[in-house]
């Protein structure tokens, strides 16, 4: 969820809207369009698979809870998208099912893990393994790693 926040709004840079969108907003409705064009920022599309409680609950009851993330990757993911799987051990089965679905859909897979990388580390196109064994230490090191990823993405797409 934290990563989505950094990608969907300005992280450290201002993300001005394209002129074409500013114009379209103002044409759609002058007063609200002007306000929107001043307050909205450019966004990098991102979805946290952990946030869809009703879907996850229904899918768990009707099918199999371990496949909830895979269900969402199947529904939201497209060829060329990137799936970021996070698992401290690299062996979380729900994340692995989602990664397999991502691969089948032609998505790139980044694994963010700890310990020895686990199954996800071996399966991912890009594996980032933080050098710790304890879960809390792995989680603490994941924070600067995903902040660095967000900074790099923001620089790539919003440095003008």
What positions do the PLM features span?
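Short, well-ordered beta-strand core segments
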Residues: 83, 109, 126-129
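Short, glycine/polar-rich helix-capping loops at beta-to-alpha or helix-loop-helix junctions
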Residues: 111-124
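Short glycine/serine/threonine-rich phosphate/pyrophosphate-binding segments
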Residues: 1, 66, 91-98, 120
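Glycine-rich, small/polar surface segments that engage phosphate groups of diverse ligands
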Residues: 1-76
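Short beta->alpha connector loops at strand-helix junctions that form conserved
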Residues: 70, 87, 113, 128-136
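A charged, well-structured terminal subsegment
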Residues: 75, 136-160
């Amino acid at each position: 969820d934290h990563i989505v926040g950094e990608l969907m709004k300005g992280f450290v840079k201002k993300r001005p809207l394209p002129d074409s969108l500013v114009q379209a907003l103002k044409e759609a409705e002058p007063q609200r369009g002007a306000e929107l064009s001043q307050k909205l920022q450019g966004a990098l599309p991102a979805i946290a698979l952990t946030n869809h409680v009703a879907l996850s609950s229904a899918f768990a009851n009707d099918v199999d809870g371990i496949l909830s993330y895979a269900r969402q990757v199947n529904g939201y993911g497209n060829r060329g998208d990137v799936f970021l799987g996070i698992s401290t051990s690299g062996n979380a089965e729900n994340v692995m099912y989602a990664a397999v679905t991502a691969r089948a859909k032609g998505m790139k897979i980044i694994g963010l893990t700890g310990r020895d990388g686990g199954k996800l580390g071996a399966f991912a196109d890009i594996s980032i393994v933080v050098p710790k064994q304890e879960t809390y230490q792995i989680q603490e090191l994941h924070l600067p790693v995903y902040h660095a990823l967000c900074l790099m993405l923001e620089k790539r797409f919003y440095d003008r």
